[in-house]
């Protein structure tokens, strides 16, 4: 498992089976099963050392990743959706 995927799964308590690779992670955009953990600020495009922080990691389907990933016109929308997702989870996690 890649480092950024583990960071995301740990933060959001995603159930993961290391033997089968199965998980219950859902896309933050559609709620469909996620295949990719997307870097909102790409590692090679200014993300640098902060690229693998939870604020920069977002679960997406493969199709969503291809459509929205690494495209400047969608970055603000992805950040908005992701920040709302973090807030919702944090409220439930720390009640």
Question: Language-model segments: which ranges?
Answer:
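Polybasic, low-complexity binding patches
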Residues: 44-58, 66-95
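Cys/His-rich zinc-coordinating "finger/knuckle" motifs
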Residues: 33, 37, 68-71
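Short Cys/His-rich metal-coordination motifs, predominantly Zn2+-binding knuckles/fingers
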Residues: 27-32, 64
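Histidine-centered divalent metal-coordination motifs
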Residues: 39, 64-65
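The −1 position to Zn-ligating cysteines in a subset of zinc-ribbon hairpins
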Residues: 26, 36, 60
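Short recognition patches in nucleic-acid-associated and regulatory proteins
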Residues: 34-47
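Short, charged surface segments at domain edges that flank catalytic/cofactor-binding sites
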Residues: 1-26, 47-51, 55, 77-80
């Amino acid at each position: 498992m890649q480092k950024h995927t583990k960071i995301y799964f740990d933060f959001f308590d995603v159930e993961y089976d290391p033997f089968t690779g199965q998980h219950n992670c859902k896309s933050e955009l559609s709620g469909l099963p996620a295949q990719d953990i997307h870097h909102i600020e790409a590692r090679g495009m200014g993300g640098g050392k902060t690229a693998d922080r939870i604020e920069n990691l977002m679960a997406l389907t493969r199709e969503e990743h291809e459509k929205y990933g690494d495209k400047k016109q969608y970055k603000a929308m992805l950040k908005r959706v992701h920040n709302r997702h973090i807030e919702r989870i944090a409220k439930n996690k720390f009640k």
